[in-house]
Amino acid sequence: MESYDVIANQPVVIDNGSGVIKAGFAGDQIPKYCFPNYVGRPKHVRVMAGALEGDIFIGPKAEEHRGLLSIRYPMEHGIVKDWNDMERIWQYVYSKDQLQTFSEEHPVLLTEAPLNPRKNRERAAEVFFETFNVPALFISMQAVLSLYATGRTTGVVLDSGDGVTHAVPIYEGFAMPHSIMRIDIAGRDVSRFLRLYLRKEGYDFHSSSEFEIVKAIKERACYLSINPQKDETLETEKAQYYLPDGSTIEIGPSRFRAPELLFRPDLIGEESEGIHEVLVFAIQKSDMDLRRTLFSNIVLSGGSTLFKGWSLPSAPCPRKLPQSCQAQTPREMTRESPFLPIQVLVTGY
């Protein structure tokens, strides 16, 4: 096959998230495959012939047998820490269990978080060109693609996933690098914070596979409180969660205390802005003539924006902004007023 014919083939799209990796072909409405971005290794000695075979497990098989495995994520806060495991996961994407295609025959669109180290991008390119021999590679910011998915070319994308939270203002298809805001507080930090609260309530989840149970509890039981100070004084309704072994646990105030970390990173000693401040600061760093348009086109993306309680156009804003922001921000952004002139879209799979 000639090189031109190869480049003209349908590109492979790999959304390389810190917690979940999604893969498919360009032009499809949804990803073809989606699985956790981790590698599992057996932590027990194999003593029977019929035991699970293999030293490394990825994808659905790792999910199915995670109780026997030591789970390790190759990415932390959007940056690859273990390139050997990351390469194994990408190899699995092309395997017969996933896309069932040859990497040499398809260009690749790879996503990454903004403001990542340049070395991270260079190493990814090196792996795809030298190991997988792809004919072409394009690395794009996740936020830009989220805006494209809504059919818009102007807006500000607040993307909060498993490893990174960032706000990216885009105007008529142009991202504004000087206005991009990023904090390394996201879903995995909320899961760890929830695990700490559950331990205080008498439920101990210490192994790497049990951490995935905490993550599932977070996704199903946690919510954002509009007024956390008030909820602390009230008798919080407890939610029951069924564990894989059939037992149940009751979760109380931890349901709203853990996600509060997104708005108050100081709860774990981090000196960074909350997710609501990141959004406003990113818009404020943009040109004054563009701010009203950006405030009118806010796109939420990423798994950590799926908590119950995220503000919709008819609901009050979950957090009051600092006094320094309120003077330059539409008054509807404060807690007491609804999001009347602001259009919020939620995108994701």
Curated annotation (Swiss-Prot):
The modification N-acetylmethionine is found at M1. It is found in: Cytoplasm, Cytoskeleton; Cytoplasm, Cytoskeleton, Microtubule organizing center, Centrosome; Cytoplasm, Cell cortex. SUPFAM superfamilies: Actin-like ATPase domain. One of its GO terms (molecular function) is ATP binding. The keyword Secreted does not apply. Disulfide bonds: none annotated. InterPro entries: Actin, Actin/actin-like_CS, ATPase_NBD. GO terms for cellular component: cell cortex; centrosome; dynactin complex. The keyword Nucleotide-binding applies. PROSITE patterns: ACTINS_ACT_LIKE. Its main location: cytoplasm. Keywords: Acetylation, ATP-binding, Cytoplasm, Cytoskeleton, Nucleotide-binding. PANTHER family: ACTIN (PTHR11937). Part of the ACTR1A/ACTB filament around which the dynactin complex is built. The dynactin multiprotein complex activates the molecular motor dynein for ultra-processive transport along microtubules. Part of the ACTR1A/ACTB filament around which the dynactin complex is built. The filament contains 8 copies of ACTR1A and 1 ACTB. Interacts with dynein and adapters such as BICD2. Interacts with BCCIP (isoform 2/alpha). Belongs to the actin family. ARP1 subfamily. This is Alpha-centractin.
